[in-house]
Amino acid sequence: MCVSTPCHSRAGWHTAGVELSQTLEWRGRSVAWDKFGNGPAVVMCHGTPWSSQLWWPFARAFAAEFSVYLWDMPGYGQSSKDAAHDVDLGIQGELLTDLLRHWNLEAPHVVAHDYGGAVALRAHLLHGARYTSLALIDVVALRPWGSGYFRLVADNADVFAAQPASVHRGALEAYIAGASHRGLTPAQMAVLTTPWLSEEGQVAFYRQIAQADERYTDEIQDRYASIEVPVAVVWGRDDAWIPVDRAEELARLIPGATLEVIDGAGHLIQFDAPVELAVSLQRWLTARSHPR
């Protein structure tokens, strides 16, 4: 089943990005976003250190049946990276809530990956954002999260931000490579690293890590049992960043949540198993948009 996706080799997946053509000015930040297609609304949320580019091939495919919204969190991708602006999960959850209002979306489908999961959950549980369904893909939602590298950066963010560009690039590529189980092509690595390679991007990369804090998931974890919208938990079996046992625990905590584990995929499931993920999401979104 091709679900209108580019069903070619993995090497050709994610080699070209998309320029987000719209901007929302929000609390001094410029938030890049765009909309593709027509139909039931689907909002796709990225994580760290990623951007909406990770979701672009899926958005392009789903646009045949859905209105797909892509956006970059401030501090990421094509959105502003002002050093004076906080980029923590608390701010991003407030922004997502306001974005849904700006788009006049009463209850869209939401698909979230990594940090995007915590952002979507905070918007729903703390700020009243309503969803028709919520798909959580290898998400940050349960403590503990954050690696020893995160803690090292948090304690020395200024030092890391001042590294020579070549040293930063090497560290960045090594860090990102660990998120893929099958390995990244040079073109895929370029899509992921490019936003962080400028002088502004280098500072922004370490700033967002320094502002990572488990309290943002602690504040909502006890509320997962109150979630009433349909939830799908999808995980790469070989996720080295957030182990699959977190998926099992998260699915247990959310009433009625479904769990799907995809073999041969790591944290970057969009790269490692793009067709399998596309089929899973297409089935999920279609079933909840056109219930029998």
What are these model-predicted stretches?
Residues 1-42, 63-66, 105-106, 279-292:
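Alpha/beta-hydrolase fold catalytic core
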Residues 27, 36, 69-112, 279:
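Active-site loop/oxyanion-hole signature of alpha/beta-hydrolase fold enzymes
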Residues 34-78:
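Conserved HGGG/HGGXW glycine-rich cap/lid loop of the alpha/beta-hydrolase fold
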Residues 125, 131-163:
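Flexible "cap/lid" loop of the alpha/beta hydrolase fold
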Residues 144-147, 165-226:
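Conserved alpha/beta-hydrolase catalytic His-Asp/Glu region
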Residues 227, 233-235:
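Short beta-strand/loop motif that positions the catalytic acidic residue
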Residues 238-242:
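Acidic catalytic loop of the alpha/beta-hydrolase fold
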Residues 257-292:
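Catalytic active-site module of serine/aspartate enzymes centered on a nucleophile-bearing elbow/loop
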